[in-house]
Amino acid sequence: MTANYHLGLLYLVRLLIDADGIADAKELAALQAIKDRENIPEEIFEKFEEATQGMVHADLYTAGITLINGCSYEEKLRTFGVLYRLSEVDGRVHVKEIRLLLNSINTAGLEFDAVVNVAKAMPVIL
């Protein structure tokens, strides 16, 4: 996977975690699990942490989508499959999370059903 994929995924994961206004322990543990599962190098994670300090949601979204739109179709599908699985982690899917997923999937030029199929083929995050 490319640096664009890793960074774009991290930006959108952060945005999804914060979408409902509650970043609970399960979601934060899921961030670490995603980092490990997707083999995101520590230097990329540190770059992400530094770059996102104080960023507002709109800036996170713009940066994440820009990075993901520079990815292959397969990387895009994988990104949104991971995000779909992440939305299930805390046991409740908030309306803001659904809106974010649907808008992001549309902006990336993907079909929702394709994302769902990829997500269902992935193991649960936690």
Predicted regions and their residues:
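Small-residue-enriched hydrophobic alpha-helices in membranes
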Residues: 1-126
